[in-house]
Amino acid sequence: FKDIIGGQESFKITTDDKGYYFKPLKLGDEWFIRASKSKYFKDANAVNTKSITETTRIRQDFRLEKIPIKEISIDGIEYDFNSANLRPQSIEILDRLYDFLVFNDVLIVELNSHTDARGSDTYNMNLSQRRAQSCVDYLIQKGINPSRLQAKGYGETLPVFITDPITKKEIELKESYINQFIRKDKAKFEELHQLNRRTAFKVIGDNFTRESTNNQMD
């Protein structure tokens, strides 16, 4: 609980086993309430105690989503062919990821980057590592603690899956599938390669504290 207007010191409470909680709040004020649970993303809301009486009860529910084990796709972070430079659109997406990490301030994440299948395996692995690092560097520049971020490049080893518009089946965008369009539909050929040039993130920890970082440095 954070007192937005009155300046009262922030405090925490614990729910019961069913998730219920009760706390009297100072009247004539506004409160920012953030709910958290291990292995879940946080949720928050503001509660206004102006124009109510001491007998008024306010119900404020929170919905916490479980942190998935698999990587989470970040739609919109894409790269030009053979480049690790962030596009303007990618910067906007990373700004939203930055806000997410500021709110979920205990998460430690791995930024995963992938390439298309053109180029050697070694080159693509190095390129994807540079792409992942470019995202990490940007978030660090914005103010995220470096200890909360890891960059991991996977090269062309994990092609994306799409749903075939005709068969409605899941298709892995391997080079052998994409190459069928190289002559009959050049635009689609490039589009499918672009889908493989992507970045995602995976939560690898939810216990970050500044104290733990300081202990590692001692």
What do these predicted regions represent?
Residues L27-K39:
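A short, solvent-exposed beta-strand micro-motif common in secreted/extracellular proteins
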Residues S38-Q60:
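Structured interaction patches on ligand/partner-binding surfaces of diverse proteins
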Residues Y20-K23, I58-Q60:
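Short strand-edge motifs at loop-to-beta-strand transitions and within beta-strands
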Residues R57-K70:
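Conserved "repeat-terminator" motif of extracellular CCP/Sushi domains
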Residues D17, L27-G28, E54:
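Surface-exposed loops/turns
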Residues N112-D218:
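Periplasmic OmpA-like peptidoglycan-binding domain that tethers envelope proteins to the cell wall
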Residues I4-Y20:
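Short, acidic Ser/Thr/Gly-rich low-complexity loop/linker segments typical of extracellular
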